[in-house]
A protein has these predicted regions:
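N-terminal binding-site loop/beta-alpha segment at the start of enzyme catalytic domains
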Residues: 3-122, 155, 186-187, 193
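Conserved, mostly hydrophobic/aromatic
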Residues: 42, 54, 87, 95, ...
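Active-site mouth loops of central-metabolism enzymes
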Residues: 57-78, 128-140, 173-174, 206, ...
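Short, acidic/polar
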Residues: 70-87, 137-151, 208-217, 295-300
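Aromatic/hydrophobic pocket-lining residues that form the small-molecule binding cavity
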Residues: 80, 106, 141, 145, ...
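A short, structured active-site edge motif that brings together acidic residues
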Residues: 120-132, 162-163, 229-232
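CE4/NodB-like, metal-dependent polysaccharide N-deacetylase domain
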Residues: 140-161, 190-194
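Beta/alpha (TIM)-barrel catalytic core signal, keyed to glycine-rich beta->alpha loops juxtaposed to Asp/Glu
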Residues: 165-364
Length: 364
């Protein structure tokens, strides 16, 4: 979503001297220890979920790019298989996809990779991504769900989300048209009762009134949310609304979910990769405190520290990203109060640049 300084974000990225990647630290040069992965328990089901979740939105394509940006090159299925195998072998078990990801190819690629493993060894999260008005009818939305099962080669989804509640030109109207007026949310509740959906939740962007309505329904017992997915990182914790008045600070979103006991899945822990590419003077501050810790790992540790977080998603195109993130969560070293204060100061520094980068989520 475009922030108050987002028009200048490209200038921020190109004009300042930024580190685009850290050299591997000695720790990251070693093989990650899968036996040390941090897990969180889902209080609703008892699922033992890896704190690091695989976001299947930036799958590699032939030629080495990301399937999110390149609509022409085919998905590199062999590489997807290798990375999924590596993730599972090193303790990861949560894979998040959508009919909308990688120009509609993510679910199929994810299904091919995961189907080669025992179904009980992983959790699949996918979404009812009925963004287009052509998919708002009950029948079209039902078919989208059924197609997800076919593409993923499974007869049930572990975690099913209403995709992006709160977005659109008229967010409340679109929420009702996509999920309520057509009866599709009630139908999804019925599918859950049949075992075809194990956990039913939503991902949220945009209009806080829709988020608050969903939680009011939860409080009233009208609909029970088993989990929810929000954007959370150390910049958005206090500055999401300052950057863009359409957005809401992550602290509020997390607290509202956590006090209700709703497990939280985190997206955008790196703000679309931007928190791994900060100005050199911020890199220097981070390295002065933790010379062996990468810039990105600070953000991943922050996102994984709150006790109500079930999983932190990372869209990992390259094996090196997967390895580094496995190191960060095997096991997680929670952010200390002193480190939290340090990151809040870093967030102040970034915000005061007044060129806060767009995270390229494309929901706008």
């Amino acid at each position: 979503t475009m922030g108050s300084g987002a028009i200048a974000s490209s200038a921020w990225l190109s004009a300042c001297t930024c580190r685009t990647a850290d050299r591997k630290t000695p720790a990251e040069s070693r093989e990650p220890d899968g036996s040390q992965m941090t897990y969180r328990a889902n209080p609703n089901t008892g699922d033992r979920v890896s704190l690091l979740g695989y976001g299947m939105r930036r799958l590699p394509v032939e030629g080495g790019a990301s399937g999110r940006e390149n609509s022409d090159a085919p998905i590199d299925q062999e590489m997807v298989n290798r990375q999924v195998d590596y993730a599972l072998a090193h303790g990861m078990n949560y894979f998040d996809t959508s009919p909308a990801y990688c120009q509609g190819r993510s679910e199929r690629a994810t299904g091919i990779a995961l189907h080669r493993h025992p179904r009980s060894s992983y959790f699949i999260a996918t979404k009812l991504s009925n963004f287009s008005p052509t998919t708002w009818s009950r029948r079209a939305s039902q078919e989208m769900f059924e197609n997800s099962l076919r593409e993923l080669q499974t007869d049930y989804v572990d975690y099913l989300l209403l995709h992006g509640i709160g977005i659109g030109q008229k967010p409340m109207d679109e929420f009702y048209q996509r999920y309520i007026d057509n009866g599709i949310l009630d139908w999804l509740v019925e599918q859950k009762s049949k075992g075809r959906i194990r956990n039913l939740g939503f991902s949220y962007h945009g209009d806080i009134r829709v988020f608050d309505l969903a939680l009011r329904w939860h409080d009233e017992g009208k609909y029970h949310w088993d989990f929810a997915q929000i954007e959370l990182n150390y910049l958005d914790w206090h500055y999401a609304n300052e950057i863009n008045p359409r957005n809401t600070d992550a602290e509020y979103l997390y607290d509202e979910l956590h006090k209700r006991g709703i497990p939280v899945v985190i997206m955008e822990p790196l703000l679309g990769g931007r928190l791994a590419r900060v100005p050199d003077y911020i890199v220097a501050k981070m390295k002065s405190r933790e010379p062996e810790q990468s810039v990105a790992s600070w953000a991943f540790r922050f996102a994984g520290t709150p006790e109500g977080v079930l999983a932190v998603l990372s869209g990992m195109t390259y094996m090196e990203h997967l390895r580094e993130n496995l190191h960060t969560y095997s096991p997680l070293r929670p952010i200390t109060p002193e480190e939290d204060a340090f990151l809040m100061q870093i967030a102040d520094d970034i915000y005061n640049l007044k060129t806060i980068p767009c995270n390229e989520c494309n929901y706008c």
